[in-house]
């Protein structure tokens, strides 16, 4: 559902000023008459930052991002993360890649893998080891790259660059650390890796909030089908 300006500001107000939700009032005419800025009503009274968390007013918050994910993810993972009984936000930023550019990228990646395998086999042959089996990690890289290329060329999938971020809040640092470990454990259960943004908490917060900015580098490659799990 599309939000108007007042509803968007209410979302930000309720995040920045938890416990003061009922006090939200947006009257632009009255603000202009008094010479007030709407930001004064939205922003917290103070902001403090450290390497791995922020303090907004009296609340602590921490921004996490999905650092790595499994080749297959159940759609229940996002549900488990967001069902956690805490004030939080989850954001998914996606940039589609043109199909011709995506195919070229995957073909180059596959060519690099095949070259590595060929060089490895040559080294084994030079040592008279003619029956050596290609290492599992190389074989897996080749298999996944071929499947990715097949998705793009025959299954009409699109290649996407994505970053998934989430912010959680707590009353104190101890609770924040405990909640963070709980969320990291949920991700590990699904063979994914959530991580804390180090020295990028403000950039992460500006990325996860619904204000249309992205300050974090896109670090994940996915197809439309695999990305749909997070929607």
Regions found by a protein language model. Name each.
Residues 1-230:
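Extended, folded cores of ATP/NTP-driven motor/assembly subunits in large transport
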């Amino acid at each position: 559902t599309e939000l108007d300006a007042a509803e968007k500001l209410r979302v930000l107000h309720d995040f920045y000023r938890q416990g003061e939700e009922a006090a939200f009032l947006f009257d632009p005419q009255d603000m202009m008459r008094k010479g007030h800025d709407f930001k004064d009503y939205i922003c917290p009274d103070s902001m403090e930052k450290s390497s791995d968390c922020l303090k907004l007013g009296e609340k602590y918050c921490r921004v996490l991002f999905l650092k790595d994910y499994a080749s297959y993810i159940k759609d229940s993972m996002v549900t488990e993360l967001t069902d956690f009984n805490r004030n939080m936000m989850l954001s998914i930023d996606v940039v589609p890649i043109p199909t011709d550019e995506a195919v070229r990228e995957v073909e180059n990646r596959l060519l690099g893998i095949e070259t590595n395998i060929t060089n490895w086999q040559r080294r084994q042959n030079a040592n008279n080891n003619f029956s050596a089996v290609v290492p599992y990690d190389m074989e897996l890289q080749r298999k996944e790259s071929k499947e990715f290329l097949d998705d793009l060329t025959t299954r009409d999938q699109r290649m996407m660059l994505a970053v998934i971020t989430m912010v959680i809040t707590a009353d104190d640092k101890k609770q924040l650390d405990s909640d963070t470990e709980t969320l990291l454990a949920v991700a590990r259960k699904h063979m994914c890796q959530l991580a804390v943004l180090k020295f990028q908490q403000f950039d992460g917060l500006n990325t996860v909030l619904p204000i249309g900015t992205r300050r974090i580098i896109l670090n994940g490659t996915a197809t439309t089908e695999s990305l749909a799990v997070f929607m």
